[in-house]
């Protein structure tokens, strides 16, 4: 697909890389010369120095023939203006990043009036992810497939679970659990395991299951499944606002620590059910006096990554509650993964994921087989959901007879309302959706899972 992307910052660069790697014809527009040169030299894309709200610049970028137009500059208003001009100039699907909470209740109206196909609010998306994690606190990461019916869940394996030295093929009979372990992080590496793989304490385990089966599995390995009933949030920005709104609707007691008095007044007016505390969140004595040791969830949402990391490490020392850490910068995710910060939420990653998912949905409408794609475990593993449109070498054959590529696991088959963890005798049929986890990037078709 031909894609015009306005905004070459961290999110724009990440999108340029991912979309170009997936075979799209990408043109990036930015007003910053250094960004334009860096993106043009680093990725297989065309880069243009110019203003994305200029019809001349958009014409140079080829917006008239574009299939998709994406605006992710630092200005909400500029993103909306760019999309409006792009829609006027061509017939593309337009996607805008809009972050200001004051627009949150007007997004449907804006989409309808301007004709934008999708609006992504990364802070709202981050709040929703955190809310999901607080409803299922034993998980450190949750992704969904099959319209939310199938979940890919990550957790840290400790002595408490009693799975040290257990082979994966023993889990169904030993625990009466219908789940499938898809990936394991160990000693800095990632493994796509077979049934003989033996788990060890310290592993980061990712498994696939329905919500009901995941709940049962967590109960049997003594991981918490009851939603949290109270949360202590440090940082009163947009994510804290959206998150608190969701939590209060679910009858969770919410306390927000915010150092800016004016912001505290705003939060108190907009969130009357929350307790707003005007204090420096890095004040350790204050956090302890506010019941850090007994809180069921601690969420670090300041605007400074380093402060969020230190706050979470302090909370980890004093609390047994669920820990969530917001990180803005994408560069140090591999280092942060080794610090055990609980669940790490990257709003910028979410923007990329959402937009890539949307582009893939458009491809699927045009006959492309990939319905959903997640890049997980620090971008080292791809989890893909394929729609089977036609017969191929992967269909109509018992899975035990398929020669699947190395480092690839076929995890789930959904057939109508039926969800199956596949066994050797199962077959893929036309009309199925198939979920695959692999270390290999760039699979585009179900045929790609089978050795040539």
PLM features per residue range, with description:
Residues 1-452:
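Cytosolic regulatory regions of ion transport systems
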């Amino acid at each position: 697909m031909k894609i015009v992307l306005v905004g070459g910052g961290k999110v724009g660069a990440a999108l340029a890389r991912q979309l170009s790697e997936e075979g799209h014809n990408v043109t990036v527009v930015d007003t910053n010369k250094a960004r334009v040169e860096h993106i043009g030299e680093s990725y297989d894309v065309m880069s243009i120095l110019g203003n994305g709200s200029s019809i001349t610049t958009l014409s140079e970028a080829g917006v008239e023939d574009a299939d998709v137009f994406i605006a992710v500059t630092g200005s909400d208003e500029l993103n909306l203006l760019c999309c409006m001009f792009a829609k006027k100039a061509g017939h593309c699907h337009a996607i805008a990043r809009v972050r200001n909470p004051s627009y949150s209740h007007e997004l449907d109206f804006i989409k309808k009036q301007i004709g934008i196909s999708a609006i992504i609010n990364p802070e709202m998306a981050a709040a929703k992810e955190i809310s999901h994690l607080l409803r299922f606190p034993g998980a450190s990461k949750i992704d969904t497939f099959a319209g939310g019916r199938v979940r890919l869940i990550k957790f840290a394996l400790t002595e408490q679970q009693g799975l040290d030295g257990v082979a994966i093929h023993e889990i169904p009979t030993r625990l009466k659990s219908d789940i499938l372990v898809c990936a394991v992080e160990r000693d800095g590496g990632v493994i796509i395991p077979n049934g003989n793989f033996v788990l060890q304490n310290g592993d980061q385990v990712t498994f696939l299951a329905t919500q009901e089966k995941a709940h049962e599995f967590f109960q049997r390995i003594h991981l918490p499944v009851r939603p949290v009933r109270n949360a202590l949030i440090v940082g009163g920005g947009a994510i804290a606002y959206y998150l608190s709104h969701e939590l209060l609707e679910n009858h969770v007691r919410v306390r927000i620590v915010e150092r800016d008095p004016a912001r505290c007044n705003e939060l108190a007016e907009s969130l009357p059910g929350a307790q707003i505390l005007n204090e420096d969140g890095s004040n350790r004595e204050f956090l302890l006096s506010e019941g850090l040791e007994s809180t069921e969830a601690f969420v670090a949402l300041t605007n400074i990554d380093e402060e969020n990391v230190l706050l979470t490490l302090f909370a980890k020392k004093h609390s047994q509650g669920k820990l969530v850490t917001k990180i803005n910068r994408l560069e140090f995710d591999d280092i942060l993964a080794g610090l055990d910060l609980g669940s790490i939420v990257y709003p910028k990653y979410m923007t990329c994921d959402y937009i890539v998912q949307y582009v893939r949905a458009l491809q699927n409408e045009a006959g492309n087989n990939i319905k959903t794609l997640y890049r997980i475990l620090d971008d080292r593993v791809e989890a893909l959901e394929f729609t089977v449109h036609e017969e191929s070498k992967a269909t109509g054959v018992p899975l035990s007879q398929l020669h699947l590529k190395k480092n690839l696991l076929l995890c789930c088959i959904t057939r109508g309302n039926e969800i199956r963890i596949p066994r050797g005798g199962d077959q893929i049929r036309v009309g199925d959706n198939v979920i695959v986890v692999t270390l290999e990037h760039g699979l585009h078709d179900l045929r790609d899972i089978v050795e040539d």
